[in-house]
């Protein structure tokens, strides 16, 4: 069983989802926020929010956050226990399609530099997407693939507030489902990860989210 101590976290994306999570988690843990826009990285390293959010602005200015920002995803992910993926997934209503290409770019880089890391998708994704990734990457011959999903329930400009006072916390992990139609997914999951370890990782991540809350709530770890 993997031991999660002295946890280091990387967050891919500094939009309202990624930056609010990075701010929340950096109250108690070292967090590296990764973005591709130099101006956003520079602002964050100067304790200035690149997005409009009163609570993020206040926390960056007044709280002793253990938060740094970088353009170098490779280095950030190589040193992380958890990689939170908050890359944009733009939705096309005409095609009824989420563009998940940026999510998979992050996954590919994490697998290249740190396959032991536990990845947590916070981006908005289609139903069944997480399990489909287990099949996709198992077919690619990947030997380790540790992926969780934790949906966000945030409002723009109120993202950190909603993380500090959440209505619920959900962290999903893959489960072996005893039905014939899930046989391919089950085989893929077994081939690339330790489900028991991921269940513990899901519980650990839920605890990390709870540590910085201003409102204590019950959490829910479930399968995806």
Regions inferred by a protein language model and the residue ranges of each:
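Structural/interface elements that position substrates and couple domains in central-metabolism enzymes
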Residues: 1-224
């Amino acid at each position: 069983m993997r031991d999660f101590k002295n946890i280091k976290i990387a967050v891919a994306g500094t939009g309202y989802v990624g930056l609010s999570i990075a701010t929340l988690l950096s109250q108690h843990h070292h967090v590296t926020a990764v973005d591709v826009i130099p101006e956003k990285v520079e602002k964050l390293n100067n304790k200035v929010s690149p997005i409009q959010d009163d609570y993020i602005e206040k926390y960056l200015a007044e709280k002793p956050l253990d938060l740094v920002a970088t353009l170098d995803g490779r280095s950030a992910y190589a040193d992380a226990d958890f990689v939170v993926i908050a890359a944009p997934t733009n939705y096309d209503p005409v095609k009824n399609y989420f563009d998940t290409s940026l999510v998979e770019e992050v996954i590919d880089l994490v697998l290249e530099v740190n396959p032991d890391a536990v990845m947590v998708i916070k981006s908005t994704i289609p139903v069944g997407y997480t399990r489909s990734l287990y099949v996709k990457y198992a077919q690619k011959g990947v030997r380790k693939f540790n992926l969780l999903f934790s949906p966000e329930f945030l409002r723009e400009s109120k993202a950190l507030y909603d993380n500090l006072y959440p209505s619920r916390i959900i962290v999903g992990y893959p489960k072996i489902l005893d039905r014939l139609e899930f046989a391919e997914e089950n085989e893929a999951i077994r081939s690339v990860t330790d489900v028991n370890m991921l269940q513990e990782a899901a519980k650990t991540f839920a605890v990390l989210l709870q540590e910085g809350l201003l409102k204590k709530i019950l959490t829910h770890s479930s399968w995806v």
